[in-house]
A protein has these predicted regions:
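Structural/interface elements that position substrates and couple domains in central-metabolism enzymes
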Residues: 1-204
Length: 204
């Protein structure tokens, strides 16, 4: 596979995908209004998805919280509006179930796949390079399965809404875990007890 792929969004996730896919000789075009500022590369002009006639699109744009706590999908919708022909699309951006349902209803003519990301911002490239698995669901499974296996990843296939809810609960669990051990640390400090020894007793 040597397809031309557009990556929309050049934050940590977009950069990690660009790095890995270019290593496997895919032709990558980034669409991001701040791309030049982030890389100092001369891109000629600030194009949109349809300008590059890609074989596939990976969406890594931000989905910030609205004031009511819901997931704002406007950036994802903006990218999808620029996909003018039915090519495989993979969304890596964080979505809610409601957001996913709205997107798939609005763009029912597109093959849209969802794939959650669990990369740490400060180590995104290394995390993605050395991860062994990638989960995905919906859309053109056959295309993405072939692509990621070509990049030496084990592909786990689930329903998109299972993946969305799984990521949400995983993040909640990790936050609870951090809060739990913060309380353990405070208790150890108050009692003048070695926190690291207690932590090992809890986790081993």
């Amino acid at each position: 596979m040597k397809d031309k792929i557009v990556i929309a969004g050049y934050g940590a996730v977009g950069q990690a995908h660009e790095y890995l896919l270019e290593r496997f000789s895919f032709k990558i075009q980034v669409v991001d209004p701040n791309y030049y500022k982030k890389t100092w590369r001369d891109v000629g002009f600030n194009g949109k998805v349809f300008d590059y006639n890609p074989q596939a699109v990976i969406i890594c744009v931000s989905t910030p919280q609205n004031t009511d706590g819901s997931c704002n999908i406007d950036n994802v919708v903006d990218v999808l509006n620029d996909v003018l022909k039915p090519v495989p699309v993979m969304i890596k951006s964080t979505l809610s179930i409601e957001g996913w349902r709205k997107i798939t209803a609005m763009f029912s003519h597109l093959d849209i796949t969802y794939s959650p990301e669990y990369l740490r911002q400060e180590n995104a490239i290394q995390d993605f390079e050395f991860s062994k698995e990638i989960s995905l669901g919906g859309g053109d499974i056959a295309y993405w399965d072939k692509l990621w296996k070509y990049c030496c990843k084990k592909v786990i296939i689930r329903e998109p809404e299972e993946l969305i809810l799984g990521k949400s609960f995983r993040n909640a669990f990790l936050a609870t875990k951090v809060n739990f051990f913060n309380q353990v640390y405070d208790m150890c400090k108050a009692c003048n007890i070695d926190f690291e020894q207690v932590r090992q007793e809890v986790t081993n």
